[in-house]
Amino acid sequence: MAAVSLSVSTVKPLGDRVFVKVSASEEKTAGGLYLPDTAKEKPQVGEVVALGAGKRNDDGSRQELEVKVGDKVLYSKYAGTDVKLGTEEYVLLSEKDILAVVG
């Protein structure tokens, strides 16, 4: 079986799924102490980089997603599937797990 090379441009979410580039978590506290990886909170904010075609309705039509590529979003803490491409962190999640568009 041939190896598959993954990059952001080759990831196409299906249905109502959204591919989000995770914003970097805080490296140090307000007091200046550096946090080890085990003490960092899981990020909940990121930028939408790819969208699925939308959820299919009962009549066969597609329901357009509310978010767009480039939107900065806040999502549920433990939602989706974490994906690492190179050094970048991403999460693949359903649109229902997005809580808000921010900024």
Curated annotation (Swiss-Prot):
It comes from Nostoc sp. (strain PCC 7120 / SAG 25.82 / UTEX 2576). Belongs to the GroES chaperonin family. It is found in: Cytoplasm. The lineage of its organism: Bacteria, Bacillati, Cyanobacteriota, Cyanophyceae, Nostocales. One of its GO terms (molecular function) is unfolded protein binding. Together with the chaperonin GroEL, plays an essential role in assisting protein folding. The GroEL-GroES system forms a nano-cage that allows encapsulation of the non-native substrate proteins and provides a physical environment optimized to promote and accelerate protein folding. GroES binds to the apical surface of the GroEL ring, thereby capping the opening of the GroEL channel. Keywords: Chaperone, Cytoplasm. It holds the Pfam family Cpn10. This is Co-chaperonin GroES. Its main location: cytoplasm. It comes from the Bacteria. Heptamer of 7 subunits arranged in a ring. Interacts with the chaperonin GroEL. GO terms for biological process: chaperone cofactor-dependent protein refolding. The keyword Chaperone applies. One of its GO terms (cellular component) is cytoplasm.
